[in-house]
Amino acid sequence: FIPLFERNGNIIRLDEYVFRAVCRQQKEWQKQGQKLLPVSVNISRVSLYYSSVVEKYESIIRSFDLDSKYIQLEITESATIDNNEIFNLLEQFHTAGFKILLDDFGSGYSSLAALNRMHFDTIKLDKSLVDYIGDDNGEKLLNSITKLAQSFGMEITAEGVETVEQLMFLCNLDCDDIQGYYFSRPLPVKEYEECLKEACM
């Protein structure tokens, strides 16, 4: 349904709804005295062209009295292709205190130029790249990409990790964060809270 929502403009309202929902949940955890961890929220390329998008998201997070460091914004690499307007928007989001994550890196678009021009805090390696692990040339490619991003001062998150072989290889690359079914499938809030309690014990 995402392509349909992007065509009819409803994706803007959906993005805002999800952003508000995450802010509301973070605020609830804060009231409960839990240690807050950053939560990433996707923002579509259509929303990025919405007028006053930065001010809108700033206003929402202020309404919940939250620090913007607890909400990270993920944009897909397809939204960054040779676009000065997006470049300026990312700088505005950074000025507002948001961290910007480049999602789906390596999923089919040319992102190397974007790494050079745009200030991303983190790149998220797409599962299609992680699946190269076990292939000599694929592993060399992953090694080169991570070293390049790290040389720009960016953190690395690997997506779609499903095997211990993938986990060990990515740990050896000094990936900052690793996510995937190897650890857990997406969880409802209550189950996530239980897992978090167990991890902290």
Where are these regions (language model features)?
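EAL-family c-di-GMP phosphodiesterase catalytic domain
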Residues: 44-51, 70-83, 96-201
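Catalytic core of bacterial c-di-GMP phosphodiesterases, primarily the EAL and HD-GYP domains
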Residues: 10-86, 160
